[in-house]
Amino acid sequence: MKILGIDPGTATTGYGVVEVDGSRLKVGACGCILTPAKQDQAKRLAHIFDELDRIIKKEKPDVMAIEKLFFINNIKTAMTVGEARGVCLLSAEKNKTPIFEYTPLQVKQSLTGYGKAEKSQIQMMVKMILKLKEIPKPDDMADALAIAITHAHGCGQAQMREKKY
């Protein structure tokens, strides 16, 4: 199974492909989709959509695992992250890729067994689980890989959106 993990954001959307081969996990394509801060929001969202659409067509993941929005104090930040997340979901839907959503708590519990784990602990576990030489950078890419690993582990109550293909 090929899992595309997504850490949505307007400035930086992290993505990471994790392939499940029996009980082993292997890292595939990963990186970040970047958008210029001074660019119009609609153009930034279109760029995220276009790049993610290209990645899905090239990598052909079996599923997309994406971070659920969590409580954010800053309403403006919540709105822009929600918009970026929306275009990620649209891209998956357009490509008939099943979507699974995970909260940050589920990701932390899946990788460390502790729901209040620090970001550095998550990154170290991504490195260890995927047998990487270094901690993946930037953080958004590491987070996307962590979300994909969470799906591979089958952690928590994954919420799949109903699809009829």
Each predicted region: which residue ranges?
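Phosphate- and other anionic-substrate recognition elements at nucleic-acid/protein interfaces
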Residues: M1-Y165
